[in-house]
């Protein structure tokens, strides 16, 4: 089996080669820059290379999301944030193929608007009780909140019982025709709704935090209703009136979870349509390896992972135990991430354990679309073994001079 070992020195040679070519082009680029300065504009282009596999090309210069920062602020834990964004992009690829569309971060739903959507619906008495500044800050006059109304209730415990916040975040992704490198006319949009699975509250300011688990059926029901309302609102924008819009509902894990959540439903609304007629259930599950939960879904994979751990402990004294996170789609393992901790004593040992794990990955993980195995000494990366569904063999990267 062919092995691919990628070393940093290779990257250095590549960069050096590119550098010579860049020097030859520098005068030409300088003239281009001067011309752009004179015209008062920056040339808009699209990236022309996929970094890895089936990825979108992006419009340059890159425009940051109008809601930048909310992904980190509003998710229950960091695992949810990354999984929500990456998973939404994967779902987008099924609707807006990477060969036909360019990608741009969301430009239509800004931070203030999304925050207003995350508020509860206000009653008239609640709006009347606000001063002008508070009304303006919360956009209370527009009353855009999508979460259930508290109906004037102020007791945190009763709110948790009767009208908890289901919607935690909204993420927008925009798509343009492959030839529209200036991003003149949007051709499609994906909107993700991140839902809470647990509602957290305090009975008094700076007091103990309490939690209430939310019902799965109600989470999905609320998400679908909210998506319908968002659709009617974004259709009011002339640019978004006649484009397909894909919606996906994501159920987060709780604050203390070390695994991310999963998408539970999705739908695509065709051009010009203002109502959502049907949804498709998404059957995703994320589990730790090894674990009872993973064993219930794929006992063979769970047992194989245990066997790898046992073998590593037998052959390498400085190995403790690997921990993996696997994402199942319709009970089939699709993505796997593994952290392998070692105590570093020398490069030969790192190479040996990397070679062995690569062999085991080919043996046990070959049916998984994507996997990434990170070999670490504490926080220091020592090696990376990865494979995408486009790779015939695993890609292996041993880090040099990283003692």
Q: PLM features: residue spans?
A:
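Positively charged n-region of N-terminal signal peptides that target proteins for export
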Residues: 1-4
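Short edge beta-strands and adjacent turn/loop segments
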Residues: 159, 163-199, 316-342
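Short, non-transmembrane amphipathic alpha-helical segments
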Residues: 212-239, 348-370
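Bacterial signal peptide processing site
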Residues: 18-22
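Hydrophilic extracytoplasmic domains
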Residues: 290-403
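C-terminal motif of bacterial Sec signal peptides marking the signal peptidase cleavage site
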Residues: 13-17
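Post-signal peptide N-terminal segment of mature Sec-exported envelope proteins
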Residues: 26-58
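Surface-exposed beta-loop interaction hotspot
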Residues: 257-312
């Amino acid at each position: 089996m062919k092995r691919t070992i990628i070393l940093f020195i290779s990257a250095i040679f590549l960069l050096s080669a590119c550098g010579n070519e860049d020097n030859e082009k520098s005068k030409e680029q300088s003239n281009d820059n001067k011309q752009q300065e004179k015209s008062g504009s920056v040339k808009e282009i699209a990236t022309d290379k996929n970094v890895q596999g089936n990825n979108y090309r992006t419009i340059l210069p890159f425009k940051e999301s109008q809601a930048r920062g909310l992904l980190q602020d509003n998710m229950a834990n960091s695992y949810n944030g990354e999984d929500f964004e990456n998973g939404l992009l994967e779902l987008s690829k099924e609707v807006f193929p990477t060969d036909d569309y360019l990608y741009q971060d969301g430009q239509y739903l800004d931070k203030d608007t999304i925050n207003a959507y995350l508020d509860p619906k206000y009653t008239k008495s609640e709006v009347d009780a606000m001063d002008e500044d508070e009304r303006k800050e919360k956009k209370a006059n527009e009353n855009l909140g999508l979460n259930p109304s508290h109906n004037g209730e102020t007791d945190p415990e009763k709110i948790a019982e009767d009208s908890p916040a289901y919607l935690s975040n909204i993420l927008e992704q925009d798509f343009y025709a492959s030839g529209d490198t200036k991003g003149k006319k949007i051709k499609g949009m994906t909107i993700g709704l991140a839902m809470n699975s647990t509602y957290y509250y305090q009975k008094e300011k700076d007091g103990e935090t309490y939690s209430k688990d939310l019902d799965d059926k109600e989470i999905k029901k609320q998400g679908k209703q909210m998506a319908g309302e968002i659709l009617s609102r974004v259709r009011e924008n002339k640019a978004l009136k006649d484009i397909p819009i894909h919606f996906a509902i994501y159920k987060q894990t709780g604050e203390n979870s070390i695994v991310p959540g999963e998408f539970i439903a999705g739908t695509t609304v065709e051009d010009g349509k203002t109502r959502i007629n049907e949804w498709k259930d998404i059957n995703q599950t994320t589990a730790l390896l090894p674990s009872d939960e993973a064993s219930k879904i794929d006992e063979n994979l769970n047992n194989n992972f245990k066997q790898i751990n046992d073998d590593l402990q037998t052959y390498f004294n400085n190995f403790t135990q690997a921990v993996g996170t696997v994402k199942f789609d319709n009970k089939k393992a699709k993505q796997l991430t593994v952290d392998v901790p070692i105590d570093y004593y020398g490069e030969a040992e790192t190479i040996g354990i990397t070679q062995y794990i690569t062999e085991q990955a080919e043996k046990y993980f070959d049916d998984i679309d994507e996997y990434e195995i990170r070999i670490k000494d504490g926080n220091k990366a020592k090696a990376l073994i990865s494979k995408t569904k486009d790779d015939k063999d695993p890609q292996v990267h041993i880090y040099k001079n990283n003692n």
